[in-house]
């Protein structure tokens, strides 16, 4: 494990829980806090061309882009932002504009006058990158920081005075020599670079900023963002700044979309990220549907957004019952006190959950109290009458806790919810209308009864909601188990929560009910409050899994899981062996006529014949039986497990003996009909790519995309993008902006056409020197704009050919590859998997 092993970037590695952040205002919209994930992009037009810039901004806004960035190379370019902003506003468009600044503090000062947000790059705002190797003493290092303060503080004051936002955006490829020499070309260096600027901003009481940690390598990007969030959390609760996500230089086509989904999707799945930009080497407008689909595929729901900013203290303080507005209803079994949008504690139980003797004792005591309540309700309303009614209501509460609860906890009756599938049906029913008809604040499903705390939406009625829960679950549980008859008792108990103290007591009662009943690590509880969520237990493991349980991977440094190799259908996998591509029998049959001609790009193992053991990772007995095996066995998560695949496979990896290789699936709910290709692509890349980047996975199976050829192509492209298995040329291509010195899209296509057969060769295509050569990472060769119409060629990060005319540059790149003995002629016949 690294030096960061004690840090935690996520409160729950097995469930989605959105990171709590403050809101940062950017013009008329908010980022973070209680806001949805914002989608943004960047125009590619020359910033001096006002009509072109305005047209591109308006087109992006019409496509659903919520924030638009524009480059400002110099103060002259930045000054034209005034004209662009004026024309955009004159067109009735209110989308916030952001100036992208590198190298020029004076350009930032000018831009802040006209746009709602300024992006600064800590690596080059003041520092310069000359790839110099030198040692900095502490005093020299502090002197450099003072130089940064002198240049950066004026911008901080201006943004504060004008109400502008800021992004402190580190790029892996543009770390300064100062940072590189002290921290290396590492995620730690990226974090320190940004934190230096943040500390300066905070010293001047400026907090309206967000962070980003972009890299072209998804592994580096994921590690950097995780480390940043962990460092922010370690700094203190007031370092809760929003996060801007992006994989820079992702490229185009499927490759660009897959790289973006692996990086951005992995972090969104862990609740990290408040705004995203998908950087494609295509027209900017094509980024928007990808970003929207990516957010949608990560299921960042409205209630999840609300839960991220939900505070137990705030909700408790807001419960103040106006007793004159309480409607006191007589009901068949209990009096129900109702108030619009009230907060209730509700309990309901299985039909056979209580012995007759207990029910009779309860009903006798209850009926005596009801007689007194009936007499009081016939009197004219008064404060004393309400006090008396409250006292009687407390007596009813006492009957629940003194008679009913102890009997329930004895486990009488069929205890249907000891069965995970039955309990899961109830949990899904409770969550179904969360955020629409009610807010689900806390819940607990015990073996034979259920506790819920919820706040009703305006106009909703508790009895109708309770009926829908009981009706749906009765039908589904009977259907699942092949049974019939009543599942629930007609009686239920509800308590109108009257104030903050009562609310806290009820929350505590529900969440601690399993412990009081003698259960440890009971999985069927939930809570809307992150501060409690981090301390609860779920799925049989602590929610803060890293606190008492060592994951099978280091989230801040890649290391492959140490499984043992085995052979399946003639292919070795596991250990350090190649990650294999599985396919279904039906897809194999569809491709069988050309498999022999596919070379490296082909299906390898038939899933149905692989002998892989399917496991529900929540099933302790199944895990125990697996771990009793002494020989490596292929394992995977069973279909229809109601967990997100990332969480389910993590849970499997956490618990299974590491000798067993793991087969990753993109979905646990295989589609029954043709699916949307973009959604399938992004979901597969997020689910499988995230796990591969954490070293989990020895084989992959794609089923979300039903077309045989396309599913196969997705599998291989994910392996390539995750750096797990290289089968073709790899490209690092920036998305273009107003700085770009040549046509990136057409040039990228030309280079692909000429070099796409060079398996294992990595080529960087950079529009200018802002990120390249730094962002070329471990590229073998680089094609970088040096001046208008002129190209510089690189070997690694070293420029070797300068000022080559653009029309000669691709052929000169090929010559350079040949000089370094990495060229082979393209095959004359190429068979596609489609």
Label each PLM-derived region with a short phrase.
Residues 303-546:
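Short catalytic/metal-binding and nucleic-acid-binding patches
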Residues 136-152, 157, 178-302, 549-557, ...:
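Catalytic alpha/beta core domains of metabolic enzymes, predominantly
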Residues 2-41, 156, 160-162, 547-591, ...:
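N-terminal amphipathic alpha-helix/helix-capping segment at the start of soluble metabolic enzymes
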Residues 44, 62-88, 122-143, 209-218, ...:
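Glycine-rich, proline-tolerant flexible connector loops at the mouths of alpha/beta enzymes
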Residues 37-43, 66-70, 95-101, 118-120, ...:
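Hydrophobic faces of well-ordered beta-strands that scaffold small-molecule active sites
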Residues 94-132, 141-158, 163:
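Hydrophobic or amphipathic alpha-helical targeting/insertion segments
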Residues 72-114, 589-590:
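N-terminal active-site wall of soluble small-molecule enzyme domains
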Residues 34-52, 71-73, 96-104, 178-191, ...:
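Active-site mouth loops of central-metabolism enzymes
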């Amino acid at each position: 494990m690294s030096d960061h092993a004690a840090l935690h970037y996520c409160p729950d590695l097995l469930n989605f829980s959105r990171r709590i952040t403050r809101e940062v205002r950017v013009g008329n919209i908010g980022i973070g806090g209680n806001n949805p994930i914002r989608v943004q992009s960047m125009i590619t037009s020359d910033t001096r061309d006002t009509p072109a810039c305005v047209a591109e901004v308006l087109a992006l806004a019409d496509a659903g882009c919520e924030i638009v960035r524009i480059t400002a190379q110099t103060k002259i370019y930045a000054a034209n932002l005034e004209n662009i902003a004026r024309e955009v506003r004159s067109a009735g468009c209110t989308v916030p504009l952001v100036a992208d600044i590198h190298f020029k503090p004076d350009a930032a000062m000018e831009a802040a006058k006209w746009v709602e947000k300024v992006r600064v790059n800590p690596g080059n705002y003041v520092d310069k990158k000359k790839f110099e190797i030198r040692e900095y003493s502490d005093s020299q290092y502090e002197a450099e920081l003072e130089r940064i303060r002198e240049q950066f503080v004026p911008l901080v004051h201006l943004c504060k005075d004008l109400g502008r936002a800021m992004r402190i955006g580190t790029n892996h490829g543009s770390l300064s020599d100062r940072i590189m020499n002290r921290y290396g070309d590492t995620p730690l260096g990226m974090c320190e670079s940004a934190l230096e600027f943040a500390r300066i901003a905070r010293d001047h009481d400026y907090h309206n900023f967000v962070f980003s940690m972009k890299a072209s390598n998804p592994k580096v990007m994921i590690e950097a963002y995780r480390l940043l969030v962990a460092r922010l959390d370690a700094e203190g609760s007031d370092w809760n700044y929003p996060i801007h996500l992006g994989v820079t230089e992702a490229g185009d086509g499927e490759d660009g979309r897959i790289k973006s989904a692996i990086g951005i999707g992995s972090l969104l799945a862990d609740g990290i990220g408040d705004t995203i930009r998908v950087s494609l080497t295509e027209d900017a407008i094509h980024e928007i549907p990808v970003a929207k689909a990516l957010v949608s595929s990560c299921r960042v729901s409205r209630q999840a957004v609300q839960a991220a900013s939900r505070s137990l203290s705030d909700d408790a303080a807001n419960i103040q019952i106006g007793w004159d507005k309480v409607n006191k209803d007589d009901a068949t079994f209990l009096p129900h006190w109702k108030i619009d949008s009230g907060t209730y504690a509700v309990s309901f139980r299985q039909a056979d959950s209580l012995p007759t003797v207990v029910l009779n004792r309860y009903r006798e005591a209850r009926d005596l109290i009801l007689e007194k309540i009936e007499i009081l309700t016939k009197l004219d309303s008064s404060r004393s009458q309400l006090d008396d009614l409250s006292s009687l209501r407390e007596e009813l509460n006492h009957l629940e806790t003194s008679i009913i609860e102890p009997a329930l906890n004895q486990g009488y009756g069929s205890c249907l919810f000891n069965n995970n599938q039955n309990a899961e049906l109830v949990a899904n029913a409770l969550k179904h209308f969360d955020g629409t008809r009610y807010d689900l604040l806390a819940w607990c499903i015990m073996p034979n009864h259920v506790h819920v705390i919820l706040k009703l939406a305006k106009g909703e009625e508790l009895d109708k909601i309770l009926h829908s829960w009981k009706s749906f679950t009765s039908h589904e549980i009977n259907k699942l188990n092949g049974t019939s008859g009543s599942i629930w008792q007609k009686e239920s108990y509800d308590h109108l929560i009257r104030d903050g103290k009562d609310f806290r007591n009820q929350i505590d009662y529900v969440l601690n009910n399993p412990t009081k009943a003698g259960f440890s690590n009971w999985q069927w509880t939930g809570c809307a409050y992150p501060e409690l969520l981090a301390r609860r237990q779920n799925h049989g493991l602590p929610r803060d899994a890293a606190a008492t349980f060592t994951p099978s991977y280091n989230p801040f440094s890649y290391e492959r899981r140490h499984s043992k190799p085995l052979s399946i259908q003639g292919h070795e996998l596991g250990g350090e062996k190649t990650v294999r591509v599985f396919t279904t029998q039906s897809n194999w049959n569809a491709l069988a006529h050309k498999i022999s001609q596919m070379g490296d790009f082909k299906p390898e193992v038939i899933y149905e014949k692989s002998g892989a053991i399917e496991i529900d990772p929540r099933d302790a007995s199944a895990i125990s039986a697996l771990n009793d095996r002494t020989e490596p066995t292929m394992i995977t998560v069973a279909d229809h497990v109601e967990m997100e695949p990332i969480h389910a496979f993590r849970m499997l990896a956490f618990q299974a003996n590491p000798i067993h290789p793991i087969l990753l699936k993109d979905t646990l709910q295989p589609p029954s009909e043709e699916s949307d290709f973009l959604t399938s692509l992004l979901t597969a890349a997020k689910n499988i790519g995230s796990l591969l980047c954490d070293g989990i996975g020895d084989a992959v199976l794609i089923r979300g995309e039903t077309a045989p050829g396309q599913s196969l192509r997705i599998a291989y492209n994910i392996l390539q993008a995750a750096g797990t298995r290289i089968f073709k040329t790899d490209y690092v291509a920036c998305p273009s902006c107003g700085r770009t010195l040549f046509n990136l899209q057409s040039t990228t296509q030309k280079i692909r056409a000429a070099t796409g057969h060079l398996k294992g060769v990595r080529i960087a295509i950079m529009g200018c020197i802002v990120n390249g050569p730094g962002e070329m990472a471990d590229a073998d060769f680089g094609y970088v704009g040096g001046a208008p119409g002129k190209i510089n060629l690189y070997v690694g990060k070293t420029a070797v050919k300068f000022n080559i005319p653009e029309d000669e540059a691709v052929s000169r790149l090929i010559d350079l590859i040949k000089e370094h003995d990495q060229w082979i002629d393209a095959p004359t016949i190429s068979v596609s998997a489609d």
